[in-house]
A protein has these predicted regions:
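Domain-level signal for soluble alpha/beta catalytic cores
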Residues: 1-445
């Protein structure tokens, strides 16, 4: 393992030429080794010396280029760690930090807390340590119980980098006050990269302000950090910005549905037990479907070809009638039912030609959801998604998939699967509420 290429150094130099001294962000040595796959009998410890040399060389190059800080992201530290994991982490950074010279190194963690290694982290020669105070359930407790080194800077992740809601200044400033009372040198930070939220709220022009005034996308979160910095240095409780923020959390329009609340409250443990028992269900199913020992089927969604997308876009823009839209999809379903029968599949699917996205489609069928125009986020690679927003209590007013499945079943004597995205996936692929628990939101869905 060695340094290859010059991309991070070129980008740093490009920004510096524009008068901007950036903080390079690199995936950390420990997380890198834990996520690699090894061949044969090789293991992470076999590459420790090479990785130490590579990362030390990286720090040397950034220092020569004029970088004041270099950030190493170590999200793997929030996992359950073994003693061997902690020993590897210490070995790596004892070696790397010994070569850091005059430059400053920030260790950044996110998506959890570092309860298994807090003492090990703070004992090493990092200049700054970034901790997630939102998803890190024990982060505040760890700092309060163990203290924080006076020779280091705490980068406190207090603005949510994963969700689109405005920060609750009152709660955030309480944490900042507690840290300042311990004479901890604090830098306000997001809980993680802003990669997970849309770019800016400026592009959202159709949603009413009564909703959007509760949102903060990436640009707005940067503004929140700046505003929180100012508030943290004054008697903020009578400050206009603080009071305006507090008023947002006093009201939340169109949010509560009493029927949904009552239904969720009535859920009992026995509701999660399927009846009849598995053996009885299995016997009934075998008799009903008469499938072979190894039946064949597909996941369910077939290619969203250009004509399928064109049909959906035309419907959304009002260029075609609902009847024309449905008729097009029915022809597609019929075409692919025939293909599946000719191939000889045993359990068929209708192809999901009506679905723009496996989550957004269902959100559009449910009350309690909001939909943005341009709030895109990266899913993977070049693929982006536009997650729906769970605004209020979620309910279903009518069947979501029945008509399509009934039509598809009418075309064949073979079993036709009905397909729905499950509630956990729908929740995790949406921007969830923060005023109720994820458990309650899941139960509602």
């Amino acid at each position: 393992i060695r340094l290859a290429g010059t991309k991070p150094f070129d980008e740093f130099a490009e920004a510096k030429a524009l008068g901007i001294t950036t903080k390079p962000v690199i995936i950390g040595a420990f997380t890198l080794l834990k996520l690699l796959r090894y061949v044969g009998k090789k293991q992470a410890t076999d590459y420790a010396d090479a990785v130490i040399a590579a990362y030390a060389g990286l720090l040397e190059k950034f220092a020569a280029a004029g970088a004041e800080w270099v950030q190493f992201d170590e999200p793997y530290l929030v996992h359950d760690l073994t003693r061997e994991d902690i020993a590897l982490f210490e070995t790596l950074y004892q070696g790397i930090l010994a070569k850091k010279g005059s430059g400053k190194v920030l260790l950044q963690t996110y998506f959890g807390d570092v309860r298994d290694c807090y003492g090990n982290i703070t004992a090493l020669a990092f200049d700054g340590i970034g901790l997630d105070f939102l998803e890190g359930r024990k982060t505040k407790e760890l700092v309060e119980a163990n203290g924080f080194p006076q020779d280091k800077v705490l980068f406190a992740g207090l603005v949510n980098g994963k969700n689109i809601w405005k920060n609750h200044y009152g709660k955030t400033l309480e944490v900042i006050d507690a840290l300042k009372a311990k004479n901890i040198d604090v830098v306000l930070n997001t809980s993680c990269s802003l990669l997970h939220v849309p770019y800016t709220l400026k592009n959202e022009t159709k949603l009413p302000e009564k909703y959007t005034e509760h949102f903060a996308f990436a640009e707005e979160k940067l503004q929140e950090l700046a505003e929180l910095k100012k508030l943290a240095d004054v008697e903020y409780k009578l400050d206009a910005a603080f009071l305006e923020n507090a008023s947002l959390f006093a009201t939340r329009p169109d949010c509560r549905n009493n029927v949904v609340q009552e239904r969720v409250a009535a859920i009992r443990e026995e509701d999660f037990t399927r009846l009849p028992v598995f053996k009885e269900r299995e016997a009934i199913q075998k008799k009903e479907f008469a499938l072979p020992v190894f039946p064949t089927t597909t996941i369910g969604s077939f290619p969203q070809t250009a004509d399928v997308k064109k049909n959906r876009t035309a419907r959304r823009k009002g260029e075609i009638s609902e009847e024309a839209y449905v008729e097009f999809n029915k022809k597609k379903i019929a075409e692919w039912v025939q293909i599946q029968e000719e191939i000889g599949l045993d359990v068929l699917v209708h192809g999901e030609f009506e679905r723009n996205d496996m989550v957004e489609y269902f959100g559009e069928q449910l009350r309690g959801y909001l939909f943005t125009e341009k709030a895109w986020v990266q899913s993977y690679g070049t693929r982006c998604v536009k997650p729906p927003v769970i605004w209020g209590d979620v309910s279903r007013e009518k069947p979501m998939t029945v008509d399509w499945s009934v039509y598809a079943q009418s075309l064949t004597k073979k079993p036709m699967k009905g397909m729905l995205t499950g509630p956990v996936t729908i929740l995790n692929w949406s921007f969830p509420r923060e005023d109720i628990s994820l458990k309650e939101s899941t139960y509602q869905i």
